[in-house]
């Protein structure tokens, strides 16, 4: 076997390994949070970035082997930003044969009119985009709206809320809209951004750059993201441990009286499921081990039994 053939074989092996890991993580998230049910019509919001491309690709892959039946429609919101390559997404979606809809709304013009030059436009832009996507989901008869946020986004949001908002709050993997009419899901909740980046490169998705609007970057989020990336380099496995902590919350050892009845604690009271006091003890914490990235699994349940699809 030539050196080139060996290299190609290794690349194929690594890609298959990566795809299986993403399939497993998405399948686990779907199962754990009841994201997709039999008969659902899932509207995948496609921005043209690596995350939403990967989300659509993996869901289409799983759709072929799922024990339940669900439909997929891809939706892109063309916000009329100058320089936006309008042909890229339709050409890609037609090439893979998926149902899609391009919604054209000049939210860019509204944002430029309302927000002073140089200020961050993300907040208003997000509100406008959300309203349009909710309306589109209703028009299409979609029962679920799938977004491309991943594990690293959820961790960054947790620290953003702690550092700047004084809240222990992250992105939920599944939520219902304020009016109760739309259910939003994040099937990439267990997926690492590094895996998504590798997958997008391997699949050669036609990525559309996200710097078209000219808005200043979200500096707070960027600071938090750089902090997390530094931790990940210096302390491998720390992000996995922190995400695991989001799934293992002991309310009796937090400080929110709305979530735990501290006033109701009485002498002689024994409460099932409540951890004891370690205030006078040195608490020994055994570090979690995540040596093999293939074994990184945040699921509490068995994943939906998807068959392998090449």
Swiss-Prot record:
Function: Catalyzes the ATP-dependent 2-thiolation of cytidine in position 32 of tRNA, to form 2-thiocytidine (s(2)C32). The sulfur atoms are provided by the cysteine/cysteine desulfurase (IscS) system.
CDD domains: TtcA-like
Record's keyword annotation contains Iron: yes
EC number annotated for this UniProt entry: 2.8.1.-
Details of cofactor binding: Binds 1 [4Fe-4S] cluster per subunit. The cluster is chelated by three Cys residues, the fourth Fe has a free coordination site that may bind a sulfur atom transferred from the persulfide of IscS.
Name of the molecule in the record: tRNA-cytidine(32) 2-sulfurtransferase
Chain location of the short sequence motif PP-loop motif per the record: 47-52
Additional free-text comment from the UniProt record: The thiolation reaction likely consists of two steps: a first activation step by ATP to form an adenylated intermediate of the target base of tRNA, and a second nucleophilic substitution step of the sulfur (S) atom supplied by the hydrosulfide attached to the Fe-S cluster.
Any one GO CC term of the record: cytoplasm
Swiss-Prot/TrEMBL keywords: 4Fe-4S, ATP-binding, Cytoplasm, Iron, Iron-sulfur, Magnesium, Metal-binding, Nucleotide-binding, RNA-binding, Transferase, tRNA processing, tRNA-binding
Source species of the chain: Haemophilus influenzae (strain PittEE)
Transmembrane segments: none
Xref: InterPro entries: Rossmann-like_a/b/a_fold, TilS/TtcA_N, tRNA_Cyd_32_2_STrfase, tRNA_thiolation_TtcA_Ctu1
Signal peptide per UniProt: none
Chain positions recorded as [4Fe-4S] cluster binding sites: 122, 125, 213
Enzyme class: transferase
Pathway where this protein functions: tRNA modification
Cofactor field: Mg(2+); [4Fe-4S] cluster
Family membership noted in the UniProt record: Belongs to the TtcA family.
Broad class of where this protein is predominantly found: cytoplasm
Family annotation (Pfam families): ATP_bind_3
Annotated localization: Cytoplasm
Gene Ontology process terms (BP): tRNA thio-modification
């Amino acid at each position: 076997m030539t050196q080139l053939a060996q290299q190609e074989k290794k690349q194929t092996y690594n890609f298959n390994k990566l795809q299986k890991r993403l399939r497993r993580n998405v399948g686990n998230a779907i199962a754990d949070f009841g994201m997709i049910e039999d008969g659902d019509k899932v509207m995948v919001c496609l921005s043209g970035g690596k995350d939403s491309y990967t989300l659509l690709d993996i869901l289409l892959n799983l759709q072929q082997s799922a024990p339940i039946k669900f439909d997929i429609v891809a939706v892109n919101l063309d916000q009329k930003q100058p320089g936006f390559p309008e042909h890229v997404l339709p050409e890609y979606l037609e090439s893979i044969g998926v149902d899609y809809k391009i919604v054209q709304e000049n939210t860019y013009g509204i944002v430029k009119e309302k927000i002073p030059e140089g200020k961050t436009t993300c907040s208003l832009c997000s509100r406008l985009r959300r309203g349009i996507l909710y309306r589109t989901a209703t028009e299409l008869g979609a029962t679920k709206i799938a977004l491309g946020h991943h594990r690293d986004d959820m961790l960054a949001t947790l620290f953003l809320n702690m550092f700047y908002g004084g809240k222990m709050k992250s992105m939920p993997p599944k939520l219902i809209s304020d009016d109760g009419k739309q259910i939003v899901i994040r099937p990439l909740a267990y997926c690492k951004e590094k895996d998504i980046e590798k997958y997008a490169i391997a699949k050669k998705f036609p990525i559309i750059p996200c710097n078209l609007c000219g808005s200043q970057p979200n500096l707070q989020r960027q600071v938090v993201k750089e902090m997390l990336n530094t931790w990940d380099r210096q302390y491998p496995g720390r992000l996995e441990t922190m995400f695991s902590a989001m799934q293992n919350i002991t309310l009796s050892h937090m400080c929110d009286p709305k979530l735990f009845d501290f006033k109701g604690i009485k002498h002689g009271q024994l409460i099932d499921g409540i951890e004891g006091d370690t205030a006078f003890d040195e608490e020994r914490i055994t570090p979690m081990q995540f040596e093999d990235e293939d074994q990184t699994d945040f699921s509490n349940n068995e994943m939906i039994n998807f068959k392998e699809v090449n």
